[in-house]
Amino acid sequence: MKYIYKSILVAIVMIGGFSSCSDSNLAIDTLYDDVNTSGSILRLLTTPEDIIGLPGQTTFVTFLDFDIEVQQGDGSFPPEFVEVRMKIQIFKDQDASVPVEGAPQITIKTILSSDFTETSEVNKLPMYQISIPTEAIITSYPGVQFPPVGFLVTNFELVMTELDADGNNIVWDSTNAGTTLSGPYMSSPFLWKTIFKF
């Protein structure tokens, strides 16, 4: 009788072992097998104050400051990308629908992948600290008459090493990645609005 119980127990273990080694059709396994992990994610670790201003004219902060980090999609190190472009534009209204006349979107800073030399304390990933004086923003728009209060929209573009079908570098920005990456996990809105007191 003891032999029969042992034989049944061994048979159950063998059947369970063989069935656990077979390929799974579960949705999570399909996700892991089919998801594209190429590319990188740009995270905003710190963002500017809600209101910035000009030196001598305001008590508000006089710098546009961001701390950003980049993570490779598949977790490898260092991340593979070409550069991060920081573009700005000033609007008359908070919903960024009426731009200030003569103040188009401009690239105010380009950060090459080789410039990401520091490691963030938050995630131990390559990071870069951006600090642009508000006076430099104003001088980027010579001759423009600014309203007393404007709304500065900062757009980030992450230029990848991968090429699209036309042979151009893939660029992630607020138009094609903001919705999927703006949540708390990714913390990557690609677009940031700041009130600018002129």
Model-found features: residue ranges?
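Extracellular recognition modules
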Residues: 159-161
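Acidic/polar, low-complexity intrinsically disordered N-terminal segments immediately downstream
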Residues: 4, 22-118, 150-155, 164-169, ...
